[in-house]
From Swiss-Prot:
The keyword Lyase applies. GO terms for cellular component: cytoplasm. This is L-serine dehydratase. Gene3D superfamilies: 3.40.50.1100.
Amino acid sequence: MEMTHYEKTPLIRQVFNNGKTNSWFYVKHEILQPGGSFKSRGIGHLIRKSNQQPLSEGSGKLAVFSSSGGNAGLAAATACRSMALNCSVVVPKTTKPRMVKKIQSAGAKVIIHGDHWGEADEYLRHKLMAQESQHGSKTLYVHPFDNETIWEGHSTIVDEIIEQLKENDISLPRVKALVCSVGGGGLFSGIIKGLDRNHLAEKIPVVAVETAGCDVLNKSLKKGSPVTLEKLTSVATSLASPYIASFAFESFNKYGCKSVVLSDQDVLATCLRYADDYNFIVEPACGASLHLCYHPEILEDILEQKIYEDDIVIIIACGGSCMTYEDLVKASSTLNVS
């Protein structure tokens, strides 16, 4: 039996010790995806769709190429394993050995090249893929986030949420916001597409959470046009994109979305607190969204409204495998997180 490239993940009502007597947070646990993050949805969808209708001339099976320092590469590797496809992932030298082993264990060939993702990506596209094409193979380039077919796959998260709310007899007007972390804007774009398809994009505001040091969306919004970050300094490395997808930037103002930027210290504190409370280890990219569960005043301030007992906020816990608990403790110690 063929494996699926993604799973329907639970949407769980969770109570947070945040000073409120009742919790209105429903958390969507994307860490339970085959690749450990939401990226299994979109990247898996791109690979499956391309495998059915190959993008380039050639013969034989589709050869998949991904450049990533972590989660996107793991998503590509696990998706390819489910379809019995060859997968090559180029990672920069900064990638943790543990993450390299994870990607290799999922069946991919891993090449370490370059000091950052840009150099790894350049090597992948202009050297490895060129060599493969010369051998007559059908090739697919998998960008970590900036691809409409990937967004289409990510949009299934909205369909699931609507279905799960219905199963729990929760009416959509009770949902006051949907919170997600933003790096390059892949997840955000998928959520917007899913909400729009279900005629909810103008009814449910999306709160985009970033960390200072890789807050490319917020900086672009302040300038009024997309910017490119010269340096990416946040501990939330999975959010470290030098640019925001143009669709994400354009959709933000079109649909009245909200932007929140958090410090590394706040996000790390939340990751450790969440691990203590729920025995779930989340990396900082995921902890950024969960931070609002512990600090609902941030949410009420950005939405400019009170959230009442009967209201609901959806949190996308995007997942990710880039940090262990020990990594979180070490980073917290370095940044003097109390």
